[in-house]
Amino acid sequence: MNNGIIFDIKEFTIHDGPGIRTTVFLKGCPLACMGCHNPEGLSKTSQVIKSLASTRLVGTKYSPQELAVLLNRQAPILKANEGGVTFSGGEPLLQAYFVAEVIDLLNNLHVVLNTSGYGRERDFLMLLERVSLVYFDLKLIDRQAHIYYTGSPNDRILHNLQVLSASRVPFVIRVPLVPGVTDTRDNLSAIARTIQALPGLLYVNLLPYNKAAGAKYRALGMEFHPVYDETSPVNIQADCFDQLGVKVSVA
C-alpha cells in the first residue's frame, strides 16, 4: 500500500475538467517554476502556513482507502452533474502509485489527471491506463529558458507529451501565461507548432497569471523574487493558435 500526502481537497470545482468535480491536490513537485500559484504544493513534506487570521499545517497523509472512501461519498452528486475527480498538484506523477491505487478503488468516477508531464514514462503510462482525460501543462518550448524559469530541462516533458498523444487519451494543453516569460509571441507560436498535429488534442487553455502567488510564498516563509514584472498585463495572443487551426480558450 502506498500512502500519499495531500495539501488540499477542493469540492465543487468547475475549472478542472467537465462538470462539477472534486480536485485533489497532491503535495510535492519536481519543478521550481517562478511564480508557481500553488507554492504550498512544491515540498513533499508538511508545512506551516501563516496568515493574520490563523496558523495551519498544510499536508495531510492519506492511505488509498481513506481517500477513496472520501471521494466515493461524493460520487452521487459528481455523477449527477456529469463531473468526477481531478488529481492535480504539485505533481501527481511524484505519487503515481498512490494515485493509481486510489483510482482503482473509485466507484466508476470520471478521472482527470492534471500534470506538468515531468515524471517517469512508466508512471505516466500507469496513470494513463486509468484516466479519462489529461490536462497537460506546457510552459516553455525553449530548453534553456525552461531550465532558467523552472529549474529543470523540458526534455522529459516533451517526451511524455508524445507518449500522451500516442496513448489516445484525450488531452487539453494548459499554458500558464507569465508576463514576459511564457506569454511572448515566440513562445506561444512554438507551443502551437509543437502541438498542432498531435492526435488526441482537444484544445489549448490559456491561463492568465495569478497575482496572488506572492502572498502564498510569504505565508509559507518562502522567498518570492520574480525576475519578471508581475504587475505587467499578460499578452493573450490566441491568434498564435488560431493561425495553425488549433482550438484555443482563455480561462
Give the ranges of each region predicted by the language model.
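Generic domain-boundary/flexible-linker signal
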Residues: G17, G35, K44-Q47, A96, ...
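Short glycine-enriched, charge-decorated loop/helix-capping segments at active-site entrances
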Residues: A53-L57, I147-P153, L220-V227
